[in-house]
Amino acid sequence: MRSRPSFLTDETIIRALAEHWQPVSEIAYLPWGFGAHHWRAGSLFVTLDQLEPRHTAASLESTYASTAELAAAGLAFVCAPVPTRSGRFTVGTGVGALSVTPMLDGRSPAEDEVDKPAILAALDALHRTPPPAGLREWAPQAGPGFADELRARTAVPWTSGPLAEDARTALASRGDAIKRWNDRYLELAALAASRRGSWVPTHGEPHNDNQVVTPDGLRLVDWETLAVAPRERDYADLPGTPGLDPEMTELFALDWRLSELREYADWFSAPHTGNEDDVIALEGLREELGLG
């Protein structure tokens, strides 16, 4: 996120690091990414994940534990979380969960700089690896009532912030399309469920922003989306990959779109100030709705 969280101080994070990982002398907020907050603390990269709607505290802990298992199994491209002194991977703060990974020496490539052979090799290795015990399975992000509930929510004005009405009217204008997307999504999700025996470990969002090119090769970061799922979940940005099932590719394009719409609806129907993150979120909402 571009803006510092108003609900968590640097001092609180420093105390948590000293208690659960290691003492640090300084900390700096990093205005990177979208959806989570990040800090640099010496050799540590610190993340605050706000749990809902993707996770509970227990499911996030389990997901990061599974990530560590994949790294221990020999997947060198997995940037795994650093365990606490107690062996856990997350620490609750009351406003989310803190986790820590090593601060990597490298950079994320632009979209046109992605080393496709390297990311394809990494994904192939991941998909061939037996899933760790207890790794969560992918589940639909939008249920049968999603479109109708959203239509009802957007039928009355939102007064939650300066961009609330822009978001509401954008969503309301695409109600029929959202219903079509939702119906098709549920049809494809049922098809995927009927093939559960072929599901594999998937990263979920292995796009360029979650790739870091280091002197030792490609590393994949941000594993909170790790789940057992159809392999097509990992190929949204690699559509020409041979052997992909077009229906499963369509499923995960819709999965992304509908989950984004749900999160943006929650975002703008809640109090907000119109800061840089809010502006970026509104642009993202309009893009997902096909409004330019």
Show the residue positions of the predicted features.
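ATP/Mg2+ or Mg2+-diphosphate-binding catalytic cores
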Residues: 156-162, 262-292
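A cross-family kinase active-site recognition segment
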Residues: 110-173, 199
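Conserved hydrophobic/aromatic beta-strand scaffold that supports enzyme active sites
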Residues: 38-40, 98-100, 201
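Juxta-kinase regulatory segment immediately upstream of eukaryotic protein kinase catalytic domains
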Residues: 1-25
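Protein kinase catalytic-loop region centered on the HRD/HxD motif
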Residues: 193-200
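ATP-binding glycine-rich phosphate-binding loop
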Residues: 21-40
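ATP-binding pocket architecture of kinase catalytic cores
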Residues: 43-137
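Active-site Asp-x-Gly
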Residues: 200-201, 208, 212-253
